Amino acid sequence: FYFRPQNDVVLEAGSRYKYTVKVNATGLTLEGCTIGSWVDGGGESGEAEDLGYNYDSNTKTYTVYNADGLMNVAELVNGGKTDINITLDKNIDLTGKGWTPIGTDYDNSYTGTFDGGGHTITGLTVTTNDEYAGLFGYLGNFNNGAATVKNVVMDGIQITCNHRSGYAGGVAGYSWGTIENCSVSGSVSGTMYVGGVVGVQRDGSITGCSSSATVKGTIKVGGVAGQTIFGATLTACYATGNVNIEIDRTQDISGGGLVGFNDGISLLSCYATGNVTSTGSSTGHVHIGGFLGDNYITVTACYWKNNHEQGISYNRGSTNVTKVDGTNVTWENAVDAMNTALQNAGSEWRYELNGALPT
């Protein structure tokens, strides 16, 4: 058969399209297309290939409903379709499947919107010598900071980046974009820039995100982000996973329960409870704190409780963080203060004290 588009319709190989099919005396007709020269198939039978996603050409959105679909869409992005939108329609189990991060580097960064719809991605595993590792390798860029990842739960991930100057995070290795309402559990391990959610957040924002992942790195290491720089903001984020710094013996070191090196523009209503430990020594500066390793900005209504007595190891900002000691400061006090600060900032995010810790 052949397609005769009535409008300027482009049908791409490897994509799926939905049409209304009408059967009449003269043949089959589709809305917007005509099928002609129909020939019977000679008695063969079979099933169409299931790509694991549906495609809406009007919105450039791929709706993914299984693991193969997510892997196929990742291939599309890494093959050059970097601005497509991706939506999860089901929980996705990647257990036993090798994962190649979406957006391989700056020149092939993902610039669309990924909406997890509150669904869970389970068992994502990355072991790579490439520079960027995570669900996304590289998110956004200088020309397009509108890239967004939101509403996804990353459960039981195992990310290992062996590149000597690598960037590793549960959601993204390197981000210029927006990351919102994402949570991470499992483990993230790398070298230079390592965080439970992102390795580096440059500009853009991380809002309402959390990590219980165990994080291990060597230079800039944090429970949520290894490093924040330039216009980056962190709002209503928390980390409960342990952070371990295997100190590089010649480099300046920054490690913290929330962020290793904090030099964005805003850090508001965040907390950290995971223990922060280190091994080794360095000829450079070593700054390791319960909340932040290095800080260069104003920190508002932030708290920590872990094995460190010092919340910020090296503080060039104008404010400090508060330790929850259970006597002078409780988590009830912290929730009240964090929510007041969020309200004053015009944010819709709020904490609730569910059990021992706020969520």
PLM regions and their residue ranges:
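Surface-exposed repetitive/solenoidal architectures
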Residues: 47-359
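Extracytoplasmic cysteine-anchoring/structural motifs
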Residues: 1-51
